[in-house]
Amino acid sequence: VALAALDTNAVTDQLISLQSQNIPVVGFDSGVPDAPPGSIVANASTNNFAAAGLAAEKMFEALESQIRSATAANPVRIVVFNQDARGESLLSRGRGFRDTLVDTIIARTPHTAADIRVMGNPAFVASHNPTTGNKVIIEMAVPASSSAQDTTAMAQAVLNRVRGDNIKGIFMSNEGTVVGLLAATDDGAALPATYPGLIAIGFDAGRAQKAAVRNQYFLGSITQDPFQIGFQAVNLANKARLGQSVADVDTGAKFYTHLNMDDDDIKGLIYD
């Protein structure tokens, strides 16, 4: 069985039953978090930490010169939009972007950890993160609720601070936060006009998000690989059926821009 569980609690009895019958279950897409021990033999899903890390690398490349020259008097602030602080996928994406950006700044600029500050929602600020620097600030934002209204309100509040707080980049870790930013910016059209130079990077591939990428309102976005998710899930299930050893598979992610979104290896991944 290949299973994408929106609510693990809703399938607990079925998982226990399948396990008692020695029927292997493979989790795919979001996997099956908190499943009964041993009931899921492997998962085929996106490594969300790594996928968001790719976004951090692209953000750094776009802002490298400004990050290098950042000072306490003229800092660079990058804001990460996370729709909530509970879901494992969003937690992994926020943390992956955060840690990759911190590590990249330290590795590729004169700045040290003492120059960097990670701040914001406590779920996204870890004990190993630098929290006292004043040259590069990574702000982890979460709306009051995951509703579209509150997500848009969060986006608008951050946009109101772009100039005053030297906000240079925004990463949106899912389609919901992308929609919030687009709602606050006339589907992105206000970004180049009102916030010139602000780098926006999204995640996933809804119709409005793809239009924002195509129109170059966004630098680009991260897409998962639904083909590989399905293919690897079936492959793992078949191996498990045959009694072969199986392990979790990272199905990968890609960064798409206005330049490559019509390429054969990308366009099939970003359907509406």
Locations of the language-model features?
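A residue-level marker of the well-folded mature domains of exported/periplasmic proteins
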Residues: 1-272
